[in-house]
């Protein structure tokens, strides 16, 4: 039965939570990481709270997978984010990590070649889970957890638009957006899909540059 194909939401969430706990445990107990950097502020010692923070970031990023709704949208945004982290890792002298992020960026661009309209295949949650898990690890390795919301702002606003829509329908009994996630709202008001995608890319590039600069400046 195709309607029952794939994992349920709760099973997928359980996988993400398990990966988050494993990753948080590794960073805290194996790598000895117990603090995070805030832009223009000294290191913030959070101790064991780093583990739930890791889980929270991973779940938040995975929830942003709803951005995979238009041809070229998720691939373009993910490529921009990993390109920004290529620069961050390079200027932090983490050359191996920079090379890894560059390879991921290249892989996404290869995917994007076949995903631009009309898409021949799609990222879906299989790709989103791999990329968001990797992005969580990269954000902690570069100590940029608190600039990640800027670097990945298109992902953030996509998730928030769904949350706002659901809360508004439950509390107020009406919708804020014509359709959620936000990119479908723009389609509903008359924007062609290519315009939505390209404007998201432009916003993504701007946010990636700003986030990269803030991350690097905060280290000096």
Regions found by a protein language model. Name each.
Residues 13, 17-29:
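Mid-bilayer segments of alpha-helical transmembrane spans in multi-pass integral membrane proteins
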Residues 1-14:
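Membrane-interfacial loop-to-helix junctions in multi-pass inner-membrane proteins
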Residues 1, 31-43, 219-220:
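Membrane-interface helix termini and inter-helical loops of multi-pass transporters
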Residues 27-29, 46-220:
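Alpha-helical transmembrane segments
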């Amino acid at each position: 039965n195709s309607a029952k194909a794939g994992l349920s939401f709760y099973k997928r969430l359980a996988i993400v939570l398990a990966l988050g706990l494993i990753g948080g445990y590794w960073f805290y107990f194996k790598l000895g990481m117990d603090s995070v950097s805030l832009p223009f502020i000294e290191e913030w010692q959070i101790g064991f709270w780093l583990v739930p923070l890791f889980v929270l970031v991973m779940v938040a990023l995975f929830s942003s997978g709803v951005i995979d709704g238009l041809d070229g949208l998720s691939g373009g945004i993910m490529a921009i984010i990993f390109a920004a982290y290529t620069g961050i890792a390079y200027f932090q002298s983490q050359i191996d990590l920079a090379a890894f992020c560059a390879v991921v960026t290249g892989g996404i661009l290869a995917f994007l070649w076949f995903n631009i309209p009309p898409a021949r295949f799609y990222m879906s949650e299989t790709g989103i889970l791999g990329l968001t898990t990797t992005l969580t690890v990269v954000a902690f390795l570069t100590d940029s957890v608190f600039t990640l919301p800027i670097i990945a702002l298109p992902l953030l606003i996509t998730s928030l638009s769904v949350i706002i829509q659901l809360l508004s329908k439950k509390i107020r009994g009406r919708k804020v957006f014509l359709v959620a996630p936000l990119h479908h709202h723009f389609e509903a008001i008359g924007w062609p899909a290519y315009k939505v995608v390209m404007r998201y890319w432009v916003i993504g590039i701007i946010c990636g540059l700003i986030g990269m600069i803030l991350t690097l400046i905060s280290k000096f």
